[in-house]
Amino acid sequence: ESQGGDAPHEGRARTVLVYMIGDVNLWQEQWTNLNRLEAGWNDDIDGNLLVYLDPSPHTTQFPNPVLLEIVPDQTDAIVSRVVKSYPEQNATDKAVMRGVLEDAIRMYPAPSQGLVIASHGSGWWPAFADELVPTDDEHDIPQTRAIAGGDMYGTDVEVNDLAELLPIKYDFILMHACLMGNVETAYALKDKCGMYVASSATLPGASLPFQYITEAMFAQPAADFYHLIQTSCAFYNTLPEDEADLLTLSAVRTDRLDGLATATRALMEKVTADPELFYDKLKDRAYTYEDSPYQDLRQVLALESEGVPELQSDYEAFCKALADAVVLTGDVYQTLPPDMRLHPDDFCGLTCYTPQPDVKMSELNAYFKKTYRWADASGFGLLVGYQGTPETTPVP
């Protein structure tokens, strides 16, 4: 139900929609983020800032989902204007999600559109991975939830489905969720956004400081992600250690990802010729990001190329393509885990999945190769089907 009619709000340079799934265990942080968005907004900004709120039952101000137009406010109250109310609905249902996105575009048309997705995340790693991978006490798969929906429904939206349902190509997509800075997700969304911004690591519960970075999303002629990333890192430097161990952020130009895929494949075709040697080079050396299956893309290919002179030209071409695509990175840390085999200052801005050579992973590896275009384009899919001996099998 629209509040005040359906007449479009025209004349602004950019509309940014924050798709906020609040019915999760981070509901208090999401509520804080709403306050931060109001604090960071001012009426001189040439744009529209909207929030689709899928509310937690704990936030009784909004019993049902709403589309909010953010207005400036420095208090703890949420005073933004409800422009549309929705019946109870599943925020990660594909039809529901597309409908909300279309509402925002129709009601607040602008020549530039941005999208922020705020929820739990695990990159492309599917929420139904436990159906594909037999588990026991000795081999547990990482936590999986794709982009998590509300607790009421217990559903998720997979990255390939997200790419399909997005109604337009956005100027940027910012993922306010854990582990979304992986190349498989960026490549899946390359035709649906010009710039992709995300965290390779888990996103600390302190969230991004929207009170300081909101204006950067509306900079002209394009959003200022240098300011957004640097300000976010500076904010985390002020927090107590127990609130922010590690933050990583990167901005990726999606129009350069095909070039990265081509350069990656040229190298992968050579280093995968001996799969056992490939995995042996990574064993106990490549860092796996927290409770995920992801490793740093550059570190993987650096380890594979190390000490092989005939691979250096291909590796250098890969590094150039990577630097062309990942235009900004930022990190800040308080303490690092003792097993961290990659210093945050060395992270390249994109993680990757290396198909794991375990018979238990065969169905999931096949899903990866069939579903995600990066697998074939980059050559990582060449590893699907290889099954290593137990001593060479990396376990996330």
Q: Each predicted region: which residue ranges?
A:
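Generic structural motif
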Residues: 21-23, 56, 120, 254, ...
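Structural recognition of the beta-strand scaffold that forms the well-ordered cores
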Residues: 15-20, 48-53, 113-117, 171-175, ...
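N-terminal extension/subdomain marker
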Residues: 2-111
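Surface-exposed loop and adjacent secondary-structure segments within mature catalytic domains
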Residues: 54-84, 112, 116-152
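Gly/Ser/Thr-rich loops at beta-strand to alpha-helix junctions
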Residues: 23-26, 119-125, 174, 178-182
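Terminal, contiguous helix-loop blocks that mediate binding/assembly
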Residues: 106, 130-133, 137-396
